[in-house]
Curated annotation (Swiss-Prot):
The chain crosses the membrane at residues 53-73, 167-187. Residues 1-52, 188-190 are cytoplasmic. Residues 74-166 are lumenal. It is found in: Host cell junction, Host plasmodesma; Host endoplasmic reticulum membrane; Host cytoplasm, Host cytoskeleton. This is Movement protein TGB3. The modification Phosphotyrosine is found at Y89, Y120. It comes from Potato mop-top virus (isolate Potato/Sweden/Sw) (PMTV). Its main location: host cell. The keyword Iron does not apply. A motif (Involved in plasmodesmata targeting and virus cell-to-cell movement) lies at residues 89-93. Participates in the transport of viral genome to neighboring plant cells directly through plasmodesmata, without any budding. TGBp2 and TGBp3 are necessary for intracellular delivery of TGBp1-containing vRNPs to plasmodesmata. Can gate plasmodesmata and increase their size exclusion limit. Induces host actin cytoskeleton network thickening, which probably plays a major role in virus cell-to-cell movement. It is a multi-pass membrane protein. One of its GO terms (cellular component) is host cell endoplasmic reticulum membrane. Changing Y120A: Complete loss of infectivity but no effect on the interaction between TGBp3 and TGBp2.
C-alpha cells in the first residue's frame, strides 16, 4: 500500500519544497522571465553566423563549375560536330566515305592512296614514285597534283584542331571535377 500523498501549497517552505530548483518545474507556475537552457543555447546560435565565408565561396565555386561542365556536356552531345568531319573507311571488300564541311588533310589522302596501292602493307622491294606531290602555294592552300595532271585544292585548315577540340571536351569534365576536389580539400584545411 502506498503512503498518502501530501499536497503542498506554492508558498510552502518545508524541507521537501525548498530543495527543488526553480528550473526543474514542469507545471505552469514556472517563472517565464528566466530563459531555459535550451532557449539560451538556441539564441546564442541564432546570433552567430550560420555559414562561414569559405563554405559559401566553396559552394558557389562548385556550383559554377558544375554548371559549366553540364553546358560542355550538353554541347558535346549535339550532333553538329559529326557533319564537320569527313569519315572514311576502307577494307578489301568495301569503301565508305561521308564528306563533311572541312576538307581532307593531304597526308590522309596520301595514306588512302597508299592503302589502295598496297592493301597488305608496303613491300620494300617494289619502289615507285609518289603519285601525288604536295605543294604549298602563296595563298596558303595545298595543291595535290597527280600523274594524270589533275589538280585539287585543299584549304589549309588543319584537321588536328578538331581532334584536339574533341579531346579537350572529353577531358574537360574530368579536369573540372579534379580541380573542384582539390580546391575543396584546400578550403577544408583552412
Amino acid at each position: 500500500m502506498d503512503p498518502p500523498v501530501i499536497l503542498h501549497s506554492p508558498n510552502c517552505s518545508c524541507q521537501f519544497c525548498s530543495s527543488e530548483l526553480p528550473s526543474t518545474h514542469t507545471c505552469g507556475s514556472q517563472d517565464r522571465t528566466v530563459p531555459l537552457h535550451v532557449e539560451a543555447t538556441a539564441a546564442g546560435h541564432m546570433e552567430a553566423k550560420n555559414f562561414s565565408l569559405q563554405y559559401v565561396l566553396l559552394v558557389a565555386f562548385v556550383s559554377v563549375l558544375l554548371g559549366f561542365s553540364f553546358c560542355v556536356y550538353l554541347k558535346s552531345m549535339s550532333n553538329d560536330e559529326a557533319s564537320d568531319m569527313t569519315y572514311y573507311y576502307q577494307d578489301l571488300n568495301s569503301v565508305e566515305i561521308k564528306l563533311g564541311k572541312n576538307p581532307l588533310d593531304p597526308e590522309v589522302i596520301k595514306a588512302i592512296h597508299s592503302f589502295q596501292e598496297f592493301p597488305y602493307g608496303n613491300i620494300p622491294s617494289i619502289r615507285r614514285e609518289a603519285e601525288f606531290d604536295v605543294q604549298n602555294d602563296e595563298s596558303s592552300a595545298v595543291v595535290l597534283s597527280g600523274s594524270n595532271n589533275n589538280r585539287r585544292q585543299v584549304a589549309s585548315t588543319p584537321c588536328e584542331n578538331n581532334v584536339l577540340l574533341k579531346l579537350w571536351k572529353d577531358d574537360l569534365s574530368f579536369t573540372i571535377i579534379a580541380v573542384t576536389v582539390l580546391v575543396g580539400a584546400m578550403l577544408a584545411r583552412c
